[in-house]
A protein has these predicted regions:
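Conserved non-catalytic scaffold segment of RNase H-like nuclease domains
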Residues: 1-104, 154-155
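Metal-dependent phosphoesterase core characteristic of DEDDh/y 3'-5' exonuclease domains
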Residues: 22-24, 32, 47-48, 84-184, ...
């Protein structure tokens, strides 16, 4: 199965990434469909399932992190016992941001030690569409975002969901308790990455 992941955070100042940053929501999209472009037309359960771990429902960041790791650990155990054929963790900028932050928070909240958390992520094969897109963006980090990926896909004839807001909007939504907008933003980003993943050959024209 493919596990699409996106983490939303709150930090008062942009430059305080990782130092004064709180995980407020983790979005998960489970995909049990065949790994083909035709699967991007399938969105119904049980083939495709959305899950959220949010601070406003669970009460505090530590529970968001611990419940997420309980969930991921269960999937890894199912894979090792061969109840699941494979697990691919897929996202956008997850190698540089989401996974390091989740590892940091897992240690902070005593979910597990560094070696155990690293092994957990190592056991889940990872695809990061930020990294895979760099060669098609002249290896430039600036302006390489979800919006760029959507435009690239659309230019190559792929029907991609429209983004809802951006990561910059999350701070204001959180402060104004507009949690439904954060969830909508998560949902659309997850769906976008899924369509990109299923159609990667056409996206990159390869």
């Amino acid at each position: 199965m493919r596990l699409y992941i996106d983490v939303e955070t709150y930090r008062p100042r942009k430059e305080e990434a990782f130092t004064r940053e709180k995980i407020i929501a983790i979005g998960i999209l489970e995909d049990w469909t065949p790994y083909t472009p035709d699967s991007s037309k399938i969105w119904d359960e049980p083939d495709v399932r959305l899950h959220y771990f949010t601070e406003w429902e669970l009460g505090e960041e530590s529970r968001v992190v611990s419940q997420f790791y309980d969930y991921l650990g269960g999937l890894i155990r199912d894979w090792k016992s061969r109840r699941i054929d494979f697990i691919n963790v897929v996202g956008f900028n997850i190698l540089r941001y989401d996974i390091p932050l989740l590892t940091q928070k897992g240690i902070e909240y005593n979910v597990a030690g560094l070696a155990e958390l690293n092994k957990l992520w190592y056991d889940a094969y990872t695809i990061d569409y930020f990294q895979t897109t760099l060669p098609f963006h002249d290896m430039r980090f600036k302006e390489l975002n979800i919006k760029y990926l959507v435009e690239k896909a659309e230019n190559n004839g792929i029907d991609v969901p429209e983004p809802f807001g951006s990561g910059r909007d999350v701070k204001d939504w959180y402060e104004n308790k507009e949690y439904d907008k954060i969830l909508k933003h998560l949902e659309m980003d997850l769906k976008i990455v899924r369509v990109i993943d299923l159609n990667y050959k056409q996206v990159y024209d390869i």
